[in-house]
């Protein structure tokens, strides 16, 4: 027969379970073989004899007949009859088996008497098979075991009908094999065709029936879900308005929807589809385009377990799609019960990742967006852009009434972790002298400062200070307290700020309690916001210790190296201080770095002069509490000239009797005393900030002198001192650059200080610095 043609019955044929013919017999296998197609066969003794002789090998492979039970004469081909009852056609892969009707051509006229004679032989053979065959059912021999359940003679009623129209359709369709219909090729001469198929755990073959053909197939005239179905076969589902499921649609079929919600099948026949079957496991295909970035990967399916998913008879029917991969031969099963979702919304599904579908099922993956727009109401599996699950279930993060359970891995904490002392790592008792310390270090620091003890380290000033060894070396403990930032002035400043806040609160309460002030606006409002000078007092850096060992004989190299290391730490403190100045961080970041690179020596020299003025009456240079340059140390080589410039600043502060508020304002103005010749990126804002602190210096002068005629004279003297700082800093920088470039002196520089000097050297050599002076020379 022609392999390119399909065996398609006419539209007027009734797909009933019992079919009649005028000159033939009717065999009904549907009662025994569920899932098989009802077959209509017209048999002749001649054709059956020829088929028996040509396919004798197939019969021997099919069943084992007992000796003497059936004669070796002409026997009807049982493999064809039973195979056709199962809806399988193994001879030609492109031939399609349709619906519940199966027709195939025969040659010549078929007589009723010959058909009855052959039918008797068939019944005898089946009876012998019933006595000899006792093989239990299993997933791989489910089709073979169906043969033993053949119907008896009374199940084949003899009726007659006119089949002339069918013979017209089948006329001339005989092949080159002499008119005999050959159901199997040489390499397919076996009846148990399911032995090579490995069914998945969710496939129909794993059911109690142990037969994948005992499920209701979703078929029409143009498609059949069988292992021989090609990738072009369609899958059509029955849908109604109560179903909340979207069928998988291939590109070649586009179902339509009626007004009542039913699907209009694209098939040419009006075959009533069976009720969709509910299976044991539930699978959900999660497609979230627009929510998660899509990658060109194979679709991954998730298995969701919902309670009550196998309820049969619910109005909300489930999806059950059965298909076979043509590449791997493995059957997959996907279904979803939406009734349990709508009934138990608060039940959270458990998702397990299922491996991607093989290549043969890629057509199923293209169901997204392949149908018409009106099909989106049929299901909620492939809604694009949806951020929550269908049927009212949403993720816990999207539902305010559902709180996610706490993680089992999180440990219950009774309270916050204990805070440790920054000096000895013991449990801290609070913030003492501006630092979080324990009570022991608090008392030690207070006694060390007030008692003015001159502690000396017996080692190398690097002793370990912890809870056990903190009493071994008081010198290193005191040094660590200073490095942590402990300062007695911090306590006084805290009390001062607290007193100002209490006074301000008392004044505001008195003003609010006075009924006369409720309607009358006072002439002068109290100063509720802190002044710039008070803020400058709070952010002033703490005094740092140099860690210099006075027991070792002094040398220029050791003193210079110690001063450089101290200078590097002071630069870091100056950067933090500058960032805390009101208005400074509003400047461009490049401008902030430029101002710090130009003014770091101004800040350290002016602070050194202030400490020397307050602690030694400008006679000594107090670099640190543990490093004071006296007259004896000044006589060391290369020390006197530099110390002379620094003593000038201290002597001027002592001569003018500069107050602390004036010193803070002058120090801030020194930060803003040098700019590049090309100007800053935020030059206007810089000029505004600088003018603000010039006015603050004037306010500090008025606060000290009062409304006297000497205010302008003092302002002139203080600004003149600021201008003289340029000459002092210039001499100090020249010596610093010389020692930095002269490697023979072997003077060490900290990393940050070396970086600043490296960036500053070319600017000074090129003269790219503009001095902001108050007075002309």
UniProtKB/Swiss-Prot annotation:
There is a cross-link at residue 419 (Glycyl lysine isopeptide (Lys-Gly) (interchain with G-Cter in ubiquitin)). The modification Phosphoserine is found at residues 45, 113, 134, 141, 203, 211, 226, 267, 404. GO terms for cellular component: centrosome; chromosome; cytoplasm; cytosol; membrane; mitochondrion; nuclear speck; nucleus. Gene3D superfamilies: Erythroid Transcription Factor GATA-1, subunit A, Retinoid X Receptor. One of its GO terms (biological process) is cellular response to dexamethasone stimulus. GO terms for molecular function: core promoter sequence-specific DNA binding; DNA-binding transcription activator activity, RNA polymerase II-specific; DNA-binding transcription factor activity; DNA-binding transcription repressor activity, RNA polymerase II-specific; Hsp90 protein binding; identical protein binding; nuclear glucocorticoid receptor activity; nuclear receptor activity. Acetylation by CLOCK reduces its binding to glucocorticoid response elements and its transcriptional activity. Increased proteasome-mediated degradation in response to glucocorticoids. The modification Phosphothreonine is found at residue 8. There is a cross-link at residues 277, 293, 703 (Glycyl lysine isopeptide (Lys-Gly) (interchain with G-Cter in SUMO)). It comes from the Eukaryota. There is a cross-link at residues 258, 277, 293 (Glycyl lysine isopeptide (Lys-Gly) (interchain with G-Cter in SUMO2)). Residues 1-14, 151-163 have a biased composition (Basic and acidic residues). It holds the Pfam family Hormone_recep. Residues 1-22, 130-182, 394-415 are annotated as: Disordered. Residues 164-174 have a biased composition (Polar residues). The modification Omega-N-methylarginine is found at residue 23. PROSITE patterns: NR_LBD, NUCLEAR_REC_DBD_1, NUCLEAR_REC_DBD_2. Keywords: Acetylation, Chromatin regulator, Chromosome, Cytoplasm, Cytoskeleton, DNA-binding, Isopeptide bond, Lipid-binding, Metal-binding, Methylation, Mitochondrion, Nucleus, Phosphoprotein, Receptor, Steroid-binding, Transcription, Transcription regulation, Ubl conjugation, Zinc, Zinc-finger. A zinc finger (NR C4-type) spans 421-441, 457-481. Residues 487-523 are annotated as: Hinge. Residues 421-486 bind DNA. It is found in: Cytoplasm; Nucleus; Mitochondrion; Cytoplasm, Cytoskeleton, Spindle. InterPro entries: Glcrtcd_rcpt, NHR-like_dom_sf, Nucl_hrmn_rcpt_lig-bd, Nuclear_hormone_rcpt_NR3, Nuclear_hrmn_rcpt, Znf_hrmn_rcpt, Znf_NHR/GATA. Composed of three domains: a modulating N-terminal domain, a DNA-binding domain and a C-terminal ligand-binding domain. The ligand-binding domain is required for correct chromosome segregation during mitosis although ligand binding is not required. This is Glucocorticoid receptor. It comes from Saimiri boliviensis boliviensis (Bolivian squirrel monkey).
């Amino acid at each position: 027969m022609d392999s390119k043609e399909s065996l398609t019955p006419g539209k007027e044929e009734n797909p009933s379970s019992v079919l009649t013919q005028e000159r033939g017999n009717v065999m009904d296998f549907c009662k025994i073989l569920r899932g098989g197609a009802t077959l209509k066969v017209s048999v002749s003794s001649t054709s059956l004899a020829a088929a028996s002789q040509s396919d004798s090998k197939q019969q021997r492979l099919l069943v084992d007949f007992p000796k003497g039970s059936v004669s070796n004469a002409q026997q009807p081909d049982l493999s064809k009859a039973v195979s056709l009852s199962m809806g399988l056609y193994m001879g030609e892969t492109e031939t399609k088996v349709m619906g519940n009707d199966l027709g195939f051509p025969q040659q010549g006229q078929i007589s009723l008497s010959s058909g009855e004679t052959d039918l008797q032989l068939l019944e005898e053979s089946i009876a012998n098979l019933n006595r000899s065959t006792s093989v239990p059912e299993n997933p791989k021999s489910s089709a073979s075991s169906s043969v033993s359940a053949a119907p008896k003679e009374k199940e084949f009623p003899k009726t007659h009908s006119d089949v002339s129209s069918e013979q017209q359709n089948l006329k001339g369709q005989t092949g080159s094999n002499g008119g005999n219909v050959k159901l199997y090729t040489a390499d397919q001469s076996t009846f148990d065709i399911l032995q090579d198929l490995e069914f998945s755990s969710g496939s129909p073959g794993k059911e109690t029936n142990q037969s994948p053909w005992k499920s209701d197939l979703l078929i029409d005239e143009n498609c059949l879900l069988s292992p021989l179905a090609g990738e072009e076969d369609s899958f059509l589902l029955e849908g109604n308005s109560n179903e909340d499921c979207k069928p998988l649609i291939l590109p070649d079929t586009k179902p339509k929807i009626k007004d009542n919600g039913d699907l209009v099948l694209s098939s040419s026949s009006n075959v009533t589809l069976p009720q969709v079957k509910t299976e044991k496991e539930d699978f959900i295909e999660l497609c979230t385009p627009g929510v998660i970035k899509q990658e060109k990967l194979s679709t991954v399916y998730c298995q969701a377990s919902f309670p009550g998913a196998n309820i049969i008879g619910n109005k909300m029917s489930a999806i059950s799609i059965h298909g076979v991969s043509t590449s791997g031969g493995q059957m997959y099963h996907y279904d979803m019960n939406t009734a349990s979702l709508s009934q138990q919304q608060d039940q959270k599904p458990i998702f397990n990742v299922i491996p991607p579908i093989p290549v043969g099922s890629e057509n199923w993956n293209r169901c997204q967006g392949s149908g018409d727009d009106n099909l989106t109401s049929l299901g909620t599996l492939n809604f694009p852009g949806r951020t929550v699950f269908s049927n009212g279930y949403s993720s816990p993060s999207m539902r305010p009434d559902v709180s996610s359970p706490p993680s089992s891995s999180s440990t219950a904490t009774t309270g916050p972790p204990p805070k440790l002392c920054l000096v000895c790592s013991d449990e801290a008792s609070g913030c003492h002298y501006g630092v979080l310390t324990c009570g022991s270090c608090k008392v030690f620091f207070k006694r060390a400062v007030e008692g003015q003890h001159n502690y000396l380290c017996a080692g190398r000033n690097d002793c370990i200070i912890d809870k056990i060894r903190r009493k071994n070396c008081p010198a290193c403990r005191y040094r660590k307290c200073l490095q942590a930032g402990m300062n007695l002035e911090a306590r006084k400043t805290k009390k001062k700020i607290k007193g100002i806040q209490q006074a301000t609160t008392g004044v505001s309460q008195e003003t609010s309690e006075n009924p006369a002030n409720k309607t009358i606006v006072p002439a002068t409002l109290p100063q509720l916001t802190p002044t710039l000078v008070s803020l400058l007092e709070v952010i002033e850096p703490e005094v740092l210790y140099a860690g210099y060992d006075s027991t070792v004989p002094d040398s220029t190299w050791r003193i210079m190296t110690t001063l450089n290391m101290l200078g590097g730490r002071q630069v870091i403190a100056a950067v933090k201080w500058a960032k805390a100045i009101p208005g400074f961080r509003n400047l461009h970041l490049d401008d902030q770095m430029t101002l710090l690179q130009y003014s770091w020596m101004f800040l350290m020299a002016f602070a050194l002069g202030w400490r020397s003025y307050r602690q030694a009456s400008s006679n000594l240079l107090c670099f640190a509490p543990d490093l004071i340059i006296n007259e004896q140390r000044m006589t060391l080589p290369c020390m006197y000239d530099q110390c002379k410039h620094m003593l000038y600043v201290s002597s001027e502060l002592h001569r003018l009797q500069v107050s602390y508020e004036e010193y803070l304002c002058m120090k801030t103005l020194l930060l803003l005393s040098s700019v590049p010749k090309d100007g800053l990126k935020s030059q206007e804002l810089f000029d505004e900030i600088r003018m603000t602190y010039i006015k603050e210096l004037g306010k500090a002068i008025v606060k000290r002198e009062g409304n006297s005629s000497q205010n302008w004279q003092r302002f002139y003297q203080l600004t003149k001192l600021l201008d003289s700082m340029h000459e002092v800093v210039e001499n100090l920088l020249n010596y610093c650059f010389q020692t930095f470039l002269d490697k023979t002196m072997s003077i060490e520089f900290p990393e940050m200080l070396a970086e600043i000097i490296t960036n500053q050297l070319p600017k000074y050599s090129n003269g790219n610095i503009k001095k902001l002076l108050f007075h002309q020379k």
